[in-house]
Swiss-Prot record:
Ribonucleoprotein recorded as keyword: yes
Annotated Pfam families: Ribosomal_L13 (PF00572)
Gene that specifies this protein: rplM
GO molecular function annotation: mRNA binding; structural constituent of ribosome
Organism: Chlorobium phaeovibrioides (strain DSM 265 / 1930)
Quaternary structure (record): Part of the 50S ribosomal subunit.
Name of the protein in its database record: Large ribosomal subunit protein uL13
Length: 149
């Protein structure tokens, strides 16, 4: 006899989610590929109990942000645009300058672009911790090393 299948959709509840901590070494990693993997884990899409409207994701700690790689000629050509909403208030921040001054902002900008731009996305983004060097203050959470292809 065959087993009867259940066609019920599982919906995770906020209290039922178990969160893990992962650490990613950004040294030599391509920025966009790494950001896509990080966004997937922050969102919780790597878990079978993923629910689109609930935060089911894990925490991510990124180290060595200053050693991230960009493919092609993006290091020279890529710039981030911002505007102050005043006439003539256009600003361009080039990636090369940002990597020198605030390397964590480059990774944060790439990951934010891959998360939903709403309240849930802002909540997910708070679980991303980026540090320019090899050390981080989250050793007490005993993060698991995550390999990014």
């Amino acid at each position: 006899m065959s087993k009867t299948l259940s066609f019920k959709t599982y919906s995770a509840k906020p209290g039922d989610v178990e969160r893990k901590w992962y650490v990613v070494d950004a040294e030599g990693q391509i920025l966009g590929r790494m950001a896509a993997e990080i966004a997937k884990v922050l969102r919780g899409k790597h878990k079978p109990e993923f629910t689109p409207h609930i935060d089911t994701g894990d925490f991510i700690v990124v180290t060595n942000a200053e050693k991230v790689a960009l493919s092609g000629k993006k290091l020279d050509a890529k710039a981030y645009f911002s505007h102050s909403q005043y006439p003539g208030g256009v600003k361009f921040n080039h990636v090369k300058d940002l990597l020198r001054k605030k390397p964590e902002k480059v990774i944060e900008h790439a990951v934010w672009g891959m998360l939903p731009h709403n309240n849930l996305g802002r909540q997910l983004f708070k679980k991303l911790k980026v540090y320019p060097g090899a050390t981080h203050p989250h050793e007490s959470q005993s993060p698991i090393e995550m390999k990014v292809n």
